[in-house]
């Protein structure tokens, strides 16, 4: 079958307009997966060495000095405390809708990507998002 250049252009345009729109459940699952990856990244706390002269200038109680010089992390302290309420505390849901920020620059995200639903603010940020940050494959 012979295809004219006009028909070829129409077919090409139709293919470009077809986008894979992802349902909210898949978006939520991808968001949770990204948050879990961020939790795993840089899991160890940064250790700051306190100079001896700073500790000797001020009169600090022994308990404070012990905490400052300890190698324990915040997670270790949470594990030690019995009946820790840090992980169980919950705030009531907000009555306001969640604010949307641009995924690229952090400004107000007034537009949303049709593929993944991520917010962006301008055409330039949309181009950057579609080239580098858009999750095109959902599994």
Swiss-Prot record:
Q: Where are the zinc fingers (HIT-type)?
A: 102-134
Q: Does the keyword Cytoplasm apply?
A: yes
User: One Pfam annotation, family name?
Assistant: zf-HIT
A single GO BP term for this record reads: transcription initiation-coupled chromatin remodeling
**CDD domains (alphabetical):** zf-HIT_ZNHIT1_like (cd21437)
GO molecular function terms listed in the Swiss-Prot or TrEMBL record: nucleosome binding; zinc ion binding
Which UniProt keywords are given for this protein, alphabetically ordered?
Answer: Chromatin regulator, Cytoplasm, Metal-binding, Nucleus, Zinc, Zinc-finger
What GO CC terms are in its UniProt record?
Answer: cytosol; nucleus; Swr1 complex
The entry's localization annotation reads:
Nucleus; Cytoplasm
Annotated binding of Zn(2+) 1, by residue:
102, 105, 121, 125
The entry's Zn(2+) 2-binding residues are 113, 116, 129, 134
* Known role: Component of the SWR1 complex which mediates the ATP-dependent exchange of histone H2A for the H2A variant H2A.Z leading to transcriptional regulation of selected genes by chromatin remodeling.
Listed under subunit, the entry gives: Component of the SWR1 chromatin-remodeling complex.
Q: Which protein, by its recorded name, is this?
A: SWR1 complex subunit vps71
**Can you name the source organism?**
Schizosaccharomyces pombe (strain 972 / ATCC 24843)
The organism that produces this protein has a lineage beginning with: Eukaryota, Fungi, Dikarya, Ascomycota, Taphrinomycotina
């Amino acid at each position: 079958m012979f295809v004219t250049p006009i028909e070829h252009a129409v077919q090409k345009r139709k293919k470009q307009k077809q986008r894979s729109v992802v349902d909210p459940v898949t978006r939520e699952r991808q968001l949770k997966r990204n948050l879990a990856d961020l939790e795993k990244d840089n899991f160890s706390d940064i250790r700051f060495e306190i100079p001896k002269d700073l500790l000797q200038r001020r009169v600090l109680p022994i308990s404070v000095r012990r905490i400052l010089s300890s190698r324990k992390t915040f997670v270790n302290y949470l594990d030690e405390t019995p009946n820790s309420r840090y992980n169980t505390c919950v705030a009531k849901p907000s009555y306001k809708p969640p604010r949307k920020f641009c995924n690229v620059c952090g400004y107000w995200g007034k537009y949303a990507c049709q593929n993944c639903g991520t917010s962006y603010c301008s055409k330039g940020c949309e181009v950057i998002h579609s080239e580098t940050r858009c999750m095109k494959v959902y599994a």
